[in-house]
Amino acid sequence: MIIAIDGPAASGKGTLGKRLAAHYGFRHLDTGVIYRAVAKAMLDLGADLQDEARAVAVARALDPEKFGDPVLKTQAIGDAASVVSAIPAVREALINFQRQFAADPPGAVLDGRDIGTVICPDADVKIFVVADPKVRAHRRTLEARGRGEAADEALVLADILKRDERDKNRAAAPLKCAADAHVLDNSNLDIEGGVRAAIAIIEQARATR
């Protein structure tokens, strides 16, 4: 079973993906981490983030063991990843990695921005997570401060709005809700509420298969 979760930055899709994977005993892949890993490798090399050839080479040589590096969660890496992920050739280079992950039994939960539309268009369940930008900025600010980072909520909001615009309008796999996706607005839901709502969606889908 493949569960695809998409949504904009800081919408809560990553946390939801982890919880759903644990609930069902499936593997979980935060596909945003893949692009963050490419971005970090590019920065470590001192390379131009828009250097397509270098970025593709880095993408093809990714080491999954490094996906847990806490540095990947920082705002700076997130901003860099937004640039790298807009390169069509980079996205193409990473498609097979994601599809192979999704195909491994007994099931997988993948979260990102193009899972239900590009990576796994035939996913058994598709959930598109949304939340008010101000709510997302507040959550992201609290996360950053929890890691000991200085974070200005107004600047975080501005960055989120900028990333939304970039993600929606990029030429390669723009952020959009699949026609057969279930929209989950968690603006007024805590983590537990969001998980319960998602499980209800999944169980309903399983019952009608």
UniProtKB/Swiss-Prot annotation:
Catalytic activity: CMP + ATP = CDP + ADP; dCMP + ATP = dCDP + ADP
Main location: cytoplasm
Keyword terms: ATP-binding, Cytoplasm, Kinase, Nucleotide-binding, Transferase
TM spans (from-to): none
Subcellular localization: Cytoplasm
Pfam families: Cytidylate_kin
Chain sites annotated for binding ATP: 7-15
Gene3D superfamilies per the UniProt record, alphabetical: P-loop containing nucleotide triphosphate hydrolases
GO molecular function, one term: dCMP kinase activity
Domain of life per record: Bacteria
EC number: 2.7.4.25
GO BP terms in the entry: pyrimidine nucleotide metabolic process
GO annotations of cellular component type: cytoplasm
InterPro entries: Cytidylate_kin (IPR003136), Cytidylate_kinase_dom (IPR011994), P-loop_NTPase (IPR027417)
Family under the similarity heading: Belongs to the cytidylate kinase family. Type 1 subfamily.
HAMAP family: Cytidyl_kinase_type1 (MF_00238)
UniProt protein name: Cytidylate kinase
Taxonomic lineage: Bacteria, Pseudomonadati, Pseudomonadota, Alphaproteobacteria, Hyphomicrobiales
